[in-house]
């Protein structure tokens, strides 16, 4: 049989005995105490930081319940105990009573409340009711009166509004008419500015014009000085500004003078709108060919030796000043060619215009002996620039009749006439036909650009034959237009 635990054991010579339970309890208590209450660090020593110490203390934590050996109470017991403890004791002497709810009043009390407390109160209530009803009746009577007044006022207001609207409409119509007239005037001014490119001087004047071109360019920048004659139109004054804008878009061809007929200005307007950047056709000039001015400027740039000559006479058009500005900008892009003499016929000028559209690369026809000498020098350089920008050609000489000067004045007075619509339609048709023919001819010329430059004489002959037929028709139409405008 096993020896009971607490039984004394004899080891023979060793009479000392220690009960097992006491030894085990001691050792366990010591270990537990050391774990729970570690020794405080001594003041003089520093503890090394070991990795084990750096970690959290992983020693087991013992709950008080485990130490006691007690088990947890069941949940239902715990909850019930907690509830009872929260509630105050039922047997407390001073118990707090809940405030009693007011009982609803009985039927007898309600009847007594319904009865009036005194006859005075009744009378005062009746008086109030009467005053309220009277006030309501007065208000109700006043409302229809106001409505009737408002109705009477409304038709009056409507009539006034209608009158004001009619007046405003009339004012608007008059304003629109005046605006239309203003717009017409502005459009006319714009068209004159765009269309009226000034003529160019003949080569015989080129020597004096070299100095004049420089002087004009400086003068026009500061302010236009009174050199124009009384016959100059206001359109010419705007030409200087517009010519600067047009010089940016593309090279414009022959320009009109102030003395040109309005019909020719209309042609220039349409050409500006349709082409905008394309080459503009040759127009009649009053005194100069602009091409020679370009030559004069080139000579000035090359030599810078020419002396500045006498100022222009009072009859010089201000357009020539604008031409000087244009020449400054155009001289950068390319030189202008093809100058015609004062004795050239209008048929040859029409030929020059058509040749310009057909080839834009081919040789220029019917030049004067002086203009040929100047043109041939720059041909090699200019031919490259012609393809891109288009050569400037065909300018009429100063042999225009004074009758055209009178026509220009009449045309300016009749700018706003609506009868020009028919003439514009005819001109637009002619231009469309001309464009179709030109486009076909340009395609042919583009295929043979070298031949056109190398054989200018052959192309000139062919062009002359084709142009001779077309010139007769165009001249007849222009004369008809001029006659129609003179009749106005």
Curated annotation (Swiss-Prot):
Record field: compositional bias (Basic and acidic residues): 62-73, 124-133, 149-189, 198-215, 223-246, 253-274, 281-302, 309-330, 337-358, 365-482
Protein name listed in UniProt: Cylicin-2
Any one GO BP annotation for this protein: spermatogenesis
Annotated keywords: Cytoplasm, Cytoskeleton, Developmental protein, Differentiation, Repeat, Spermatogenesis
Cellular component aspect of the GO annotation: cytoskeletal calyx
Domain of life according to the entry: Eukaryota
Native organism taxonomy: Eukaryota, Metazoa, Chordata, Craniata, Vertebrata
Segments of this protein annotated with the region Disordered: 34-488
Region (49 X 3 AA repeats of K-K-X): 25-487
InterPro entries tied to this protein: CYLC, Cylicin_N
Organism name: Bos taurus (Bovine)
Function text: Plays a role in the establishment of normal sperm morphology during spermatogenesis. It is required for acrosome attachment to the nuclear envelope, and proper manchette elongation and disassembly.
Subcellular location field: Cytoplasm, Cytoskeleton, Perinuclear theca, Calyx; Cytoplasm, Cytoskeleton, Perinuclear theca
Tissue and organ expression note: Testis.
Main subcellular localisation: cytoplasm
Pfam families in alphabetical order: Cylicin_N
Gene encoding the protein: CYLC2
């Amino acid at each position: 049989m096993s020896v009971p635990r607490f039984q004394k054991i004899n080891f023979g010579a060793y009479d000392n005995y220690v009960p097992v339970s006491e030894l085990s309890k001691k050792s366990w208590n010591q270990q537990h105490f050391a774990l729970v209450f570690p020794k405080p660090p001594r003041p003089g020593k520093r503890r090394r930081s070991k990795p084990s110490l750096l970690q959290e203390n992983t020693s087991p934590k013992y709950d008080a319940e485990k130490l006691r050996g007690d088990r947890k109470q069941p949940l239902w017991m715990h909850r019930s105990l907690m509830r009872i403890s929260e509630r105050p004791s039922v047997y407390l002497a001073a118990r707090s009573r809940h405030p009693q709810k007011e009982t609803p009043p009985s039927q007898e009390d309600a009847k007594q409340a319904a009865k009036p407390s005194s006859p005075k109160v009744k009378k005062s209530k009746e008086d109030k009711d009467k005053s309220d009803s009277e006030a309501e009746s007065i208000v109700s009577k006043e409302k229809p009166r106001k409505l009737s007044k408002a109705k009477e006022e409304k038709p009056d207001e409507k009539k006034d509004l209608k009158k004001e609207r009619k007046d405003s409409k009339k004012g608007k119509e008059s304003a629109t008419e005046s605006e239309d007239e203003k717009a017409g005037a502005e459009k006319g001014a714009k068209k004159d500015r765009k269309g009226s490119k000034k003529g160019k001087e003949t080569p015989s004047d080129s020597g004096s014009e070299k100095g004049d071109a420089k002087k004009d360019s400086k003068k026009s920048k500061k302010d236009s000085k009174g050199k124009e004659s009384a016959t100059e139109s206001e359109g010419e004054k705007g030409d200087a500004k517009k010519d600067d804008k047009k010089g940016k878009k593309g090279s414009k061809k022959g320009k009109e003078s102030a003395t040109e007929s309005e019909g020719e200005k209309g042609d220039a307007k349409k050409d500006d709108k349709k082409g905008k950047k394309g080459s503009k056709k040759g127009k009649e000039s009053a005194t100069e060919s602009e091409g020679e001015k370009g030559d004069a400027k080139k000579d000035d740039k090359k030599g810078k030796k020419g002396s500045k000559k006498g100022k222009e006479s009072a009859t010089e058009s201000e357009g020539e000043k604008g031409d000087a500005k244009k020449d400054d900008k155009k001289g950068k892009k390319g030189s202008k060619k093809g100058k015609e003499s004062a004795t050239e016929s209008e048929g040859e000028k029409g030929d020059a215009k058509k040749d310009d559209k057909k080839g834009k690369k081919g040789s220029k026809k019917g030049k004067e002996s002086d203009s040929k000498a100047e043109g041939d020098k720059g041909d090699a350089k200019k031919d490259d620039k012609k393809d891109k920008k288009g050569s400037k050609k065909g300018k009429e000489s100063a042999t225009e009749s004074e009758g055209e000067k009178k026509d220009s004045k009449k045309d300016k007075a009749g700018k706003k006439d609506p009868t020009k619509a028919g003439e514009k339609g005819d001109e637009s048709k002619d231009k469309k036909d001309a464009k179709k023919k030109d486009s076909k001819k340009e395609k042919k010329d583009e295929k043979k650009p070298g031949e056109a430059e190398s054989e200018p004489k052959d192309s000139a002959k062919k062009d002359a034959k084709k142009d001779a037929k077309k010139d007769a028709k165009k001249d007849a139409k222009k004369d008809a237009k001029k006659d129609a405008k003179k009749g106005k």
